[in-house]
A protein has these predicted regions:
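The feature captures the beta-strand-to-loop junction immediately N-terminal to the Walker
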Residues: 40-42
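Helix-to-loop junction immediately C-terminal to a conserved catalytic motif
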Residues: 55
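Pre-Walker A (P-loop) beta-loop-beta motif of ABC nucleotide-binding domains
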Residues: 27-38, 92
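Conserved ABC transporter NBD signature motif
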Residues: 63-71
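ABC ATPase nucleotide-binding domains
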Residues: 36, 75-237
Length: 363
């Protein structure tokens, strides 16, 4: 089946079973041409299985996978215009960097001179031209990763799959490579599909993110939407840090939901479709959207007591106990210019929130 489309990849009702275990359950999504798309989720959620199905390393039990409208199920990996960068870069230790990058091109029938010319072009693109004569063992981890990227980009694939390629790098290099990968994707115009369990990687690089759990896509959207408007409790808890409070919805009026939690505390937030008056649900409150004061600043300020302050570099995380209520966390910038003050343990304070900070969740 073929149909004209601008979608680089379409996954249509894809199911993957291993015996009696279902690894993917009716997954459907589309990935646009020239998009940086990330599959994000914990270990065992099905993200790598889906990536391997797109690459052709795993068969689809049910459903289909389409590349620019053409079904590719049954097409072997080497006949798909798709390349993969794995966690293990799998560079040939006896070959130079230039030969490693050009090897795949020669296997595709390019002459040695053509392969070397193209290899030189992509090495320049990833800023490794000066290392072309070196062996992989003479390179750092970050340089080896860029060689693997260059090798995957050399044949000009329509789609590049990246299976947690940054996981072996140290934090500082990983952050630098996140920016470099994003720039490289825009420069080449190739669709990137990136797999990771790291929320920061996903939010930093991606045009859109599919958050996965238990073989299903829990939410699909851009970074801001995923973070600020999580669809359910799993997404809110998995993406970043949040306070999850069990609340009862008392009433809904003019698009606002009035809720109460333990200890007589009351909070108001935007109403959410599917959650009506009387519902017992969870509310998400991001710590960085809360601030502390010595006196209430609004009618719904929550009285609490500081238990502990944790210094984490640029921020300070404060753990609080609400009066007759749950534990709370507030995150403040480690700067005198920040909105939230930092109080000593044992101090009675009030927790205040920015408008829009609270989000009701469909459990």
């Amino acid at each position: 089946m073929t149909r004209k489309t601008n979608d680089a990849i379409e996954v249509r009702n894809a199911v993957k079973r291993y015996g009696t275990f279902t690894a993917l359950k009716q997954v459907s999504l589309t990935i646009s041409d020239n998009e940086f798309f990330t599959l994000l989720g914990p270990s065992g959620c099905g993200k790598t299985t889906l990536l391997r199905m797109i690459a052709g390393f795993e068969d689809v039990t049910e459903g289909g996978i389409f590349l620019f409208g053409e079904e590719i199920e049954g097409l072997p990996p080497h006949k798909r215009p798709i390349n993969t960068v794995f966690q293990n870069y799998a560079l040939f230790p006896h070959m130079t960097v230039l030969d490693n990058v050009g090897f795949g091109l020669e296997m595709l029938g390019k002459s040695k001179s053509e392969a070397r010319k193209r290899a030189g072009e992509v090495l320049e693109m990833v800023q490794l031209s000066q290392f072309s004569a070196r062996k992989p063992s003479q390179l750092s981890g970050g340089q080896q990763q860029r060689v693997a990227l260059a090798r995957a980009l050399a044949p000009r694939p329509k789609v590049l799959l990246l299976d947690e390629p940054l996981s072996a790098l140290d934090l500082k290099l990983r952050k630098a490579m996140q920016i470099e990968l994003k720039h490289l994707q825009k420069e080449t115009g190739i669709t990137f599909i990136f797999v990771t369990h790291d929320q920061e990687e996903a939010l930093t690089m991606s045009d859109r993110v599919a958050v996965m759990s238990a073989g299903e896509v829990q939410q699909l959207g851009d970074a801001r939407e995923i973070y600020e408007r999580p669809r359910n409790m799993f997404v809110a808890d998995f993406i970043g840090e949040t306070n999850l409070l069990e609340v009862t919805v008392d009433q809904i009026d003019a698009g606002r939901a009035a809720c109460h939690l333990g200890g007589g505390h009351r909070l108001t937030c935007d109403a959410v479709d599917g959650i009506g008056a009387g519902a017992r649900v969870h509310m998400s409150l991001r710590p960085e959207r809360l601030f502390l004061s010595s006196a209430p600043t609004e009618s719904e300020s929550l009285k609490a007591r500081v238990r502990e302050n944790i210094f984490i570099g640029t921020d300070i995380s404060t753990i609080l106990d609400l009066d007759d209520g749950p534990e709370f966390r507030v995150r403040a910038s480690n700067s005198s210019r920040g909105t939230s003050r930092v109080f000593d343990p044992g101090t009675e304070v009030f927790v205040n929130m920015e408008r829009g900070a609270a989000r009701l969740l469909v459990d």
